[in-house]
Amino acid sequence: LRVGEMYLIAAEASYMKDGSGLSFLNDLRSKRGATALLNLSGAQLFSQIKDEWARETCGEGFRLDCLKRWGDGCRRMAAQHLTDGFLRNDPNYLDLNVPATDKHFVWELPQNDTQANTNLQKNWE
């Protein structure tokens, strides 16, 4: 757990509790050399908190957990590549849209756990 994560957890928890959290978000942003965000509330504030989660934890394996927690699901758009100076879509790369309620967002309970504790019920098909 890093200090940046603690600020993000505090910002998100404050937002969920009473709609605040901007001060935690701005504290983190100032430590990263970014400008403070002013007069944000509601959906705009939550959007900024989500964006900061993506920036702060990029490549660290948090993204799917965050998307599930927020109920956002996962959306992958067709890949693009540069050809002759123009950005073109690759028809061999399919779009993907997985809602947060999809079973693929749930990790199956480990077999050792279900064998050791017969009271555990299978949580995945």
Describe the residue ranges of each PLM region.
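Acidic/polar-rich alpha-helix caps and helix-coil junctions
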Residues: 1-125
